Amino acid sequence: MKIFALQRQSHVAEGVASLSVSARITEVLEYMQYTSSDVQFVSLPEEHDLCRGALLWADTLILSKHSSLNAIALAEVAKKLGKKIIYDIDDWIFSFPSYSGGSGQNDKVENIRSLLSLSDVITVANEVLYRRLINTYPNLKLVPNGMWVEKYQRLAGEVLANEDIRPKIVFTNADLIKMESGKDSLFSALQVFFSKHQNYSLDFFGDPFPEIPSLPFLHFTNRMPYDSYMRALIRGRYDFSITPLGAAEDKESLSFNECKNPFKYLNYGAARVPGIYSSSSIYTNCVEDGINGLLVDNDYHSWLGALELLASNHSLREKIRNNAFDDVMKNYHIRFSADALLEVLEESS
């Protein structure tokens, strides 16, 4: 079984590789290759000179939210060669909200539809996407998100303690901040918390956003490859994490946000970092408040209260840390993703 996973640039950060392709496709293929000698794969950017050669070699072409004319041309070649085409979706790619840097992709919906029409199978990451698309695309299959926990636990064995001697919080965000009405409340809560707890720092991984200058306690690190990011989470030995996302109060972006995935919970759980999460549906579906995370409304008092609670309660942090890890290991392991993708590959071979 030979697979060509087409890489692309991020829709929300110009000039950098897509994290969706890495987390959703190549990580799963790497796991499948690690556990089975029957799977071989190659991944190349869509503009690479060797893409045509990779198509000749492969049995199957996998795309992930691609929208370029170049991707269409490659898919058309794959179709003529008799190759099977799988198109993966993990967001509502048919329209981006105004807060998103991906809103510039809204004029490429016809390109996406062209690629979907060329595809033998369309895979989606969650039940919400499945329900919204199944009537239009009957060739739809669910391939859930998952974490290759053991891959990163090998590194965790080198870490001597769960928390650094210097208390640190981690915040990860691709694109702009995914909140509208509650954004000022979040930033106010952070400013008050860090003014009271000047021994704490906030490590940020992701794309720059306009409000960074107002957060002098924030240490910015640009987005990095998925493997490197996971290693940074483990080596960071963070006290806890924050994950803001607009919920019911953000009417314009609610439908889009409901189609997102709780990958940050999966990442933090696998890295044993306890987290505070907005009470958005993607997190209320996997986080039990006070058990494997904290859930907060997107207002000033809720965010500040959760920050103070986790900062002051070591036993709660340890409880959440262990429960989240166990939950990800049991319910969100990459083996479920691999099993689902293998079924799709075998059906489309």
Q: PLM ranges: what are they?
A:
Residues 7-28, 148-236:
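Conserved catalytic-core segment of nucleotide-activated headgroup transferases in glycan assembly
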Residues 56, 76-77, 103-122:
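Membrane-proximal helix-turn-helix segments that form the acceptor-binding/catalytic region
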Residues 1-65, 71:
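N-terminal pre-catalytic "stem/leader" segment of glycosyltransferase-like enzymes
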Residues 262, 287-290, 294-300, 309-315:
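Conserved acidic donor-binding segment of nucleotide-sugar-dependent glycosyltransferases
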